[in-house]
Regions:
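Non-catalytic alpha-helical scaffold/packing segments enriched in small hydrophobic residues
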Residues: 176, 199, 216-219
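Short, conserved phosphate-binding/catalytic loop or strand-edge motifs used
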Residues: 192-202
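Short, contiguous, pocket-lining structural segments
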Residues: 169, 192-194, 212
Length: 319
């Protein structure tokens, strides 16, 4: 966003849509800026801001909130309105952490009803900071939002390598899969997960059902496996994954989730799931992932997926 618009409307619906909107023109006296809280304001949203959640590096709740405060302009389009799952660690990383898929007592989050389940989302920076308040060390998103009637916004291919594979082998595999997707007229964007793997995000036109997107993600994954069965597998059984890269297409099943770009990870080194350009990926060392400590001192200001948001890609088989 770059400008403010003045709009009259009769009411705001429960899904945050304007009823009977009338565009009155642009505001020439105001220019758009993303919200950014002061340190004192951040602390008012947090319970126990000095609580240490990453003991090894003495990273506090406030440190995590400060990081999200800075990267909000970059994370917002991956996060806002998406159905969310959280990995929460109230006692810090490694101590009785748990996945949270339902809103429950997290009253500051926006409720979303999905098949009679009380799920949740956030719509602004304050909501993101509240996730930190609830000790969320990982933010996982679904591939959809209520605003688009839960039509998938992207396909994600999760490349989960065996520990024996080198960083370079995994990166070369990502480039190989990129070329396969290109032949299907699909551009993809890499994200290092903060662990040993890579996610490839493929933006989509919101024109397909959840079942269509799941089926095509499975078909493409099987195609990749068929081309190099000695390197790729779509089987989740550990005994079948030795010295191979597991392509987890199940991330695209309705109700499944994957780590949000720019989210912290719940490990002792406080790594971060980070989107990178293909040029950056070629130089990346998956054995030395990006950490929150590095980003706290120098937060990114530009999104590396420059062309991601303008793509309206269609799945060839369904055109």
């Amino acid at each position: 966003p770059k400008f403010y618009a003045q709009i009259n409307y009769t009411e705001l619906t429960s899904s945050l849509k304007l009823r009977h909107p009338v565009f009155l023109g642009l505001r020439e006296d105001k220019f758009f800026q993303y919200p950014n809280y002061s340190n004192d304001e951040l602390k008012t949203f947090l319970t126990s801001p000095n609580k240490i959640l990453y003991p090894r590096h003495k990273i506090t709740k406030f440190d995590i909130a400060s990081y999200y405060n800075e990267v909000y302009p970059l994370i917002r389009q991956h996060l806002i309105g998406r159905v969310l799952n959280l990995y929460r660690c109230p006692k810090g990383v490694g101590n009785n952490c748990f996945f949270n898929r339902h809103r429950g007592s997290m009253r500051n989050l926006v409720p979303i009803q999905v098949k009679n389940q009380n799920n949740f989302t956030v719509y602004d920076l304050k909501g993101l900071i509240y996730l930190v308040r609830y000790n969320a060390l990982e933010i996982h998103t679904w591939n959809c939002s209520k605003e688009n009637d839960f039509a998938p916004k992207e396909i994600v291919f999760d490349l989960d390598p065996a520990v024996s594979l080198s960083s370079q082998m995994v990166i070369e595999a990502a480039f190989e899969i990129r070329e396969i997707l290109k032949r299907l007229e699909l551009d993809s964007f890499p994200k290092v997960t903060g662990g040993k793997g890579i996610h490839l995000h493929v933006p989509l036109s919101a024109a397909y059902s959840q079942l269509q997107v799941y089926d095509i993600s499975k078909s493409i994954s099987l195609l990749i496996e068929e081309q190099r069965p000695q390197l790729y597998t779509t089987t989740s059984r550990l005994k079948d994954r030795k010295s191979k890269i597991f392509i987890d297409y199940l991330r695209n099943n309705f109700g499944s989730s994957y780590i949000c770009p720019f989210s912290t990870r719940a490990n002792e080194n406080a790594t971060v799931a980070f989107p990178v350009s293909w040029q950056e990926l070629n130089k990346y060392d998956l054995k030395d992932p990006l950490t929150l400590m590095k980003l706290i001192s120098k937060a990114p200001v530009k999104h590396p997926w420059r062309d991601y948001w303008g793509l309206d890609q269609r799945i060839k088989i369904y055109k």
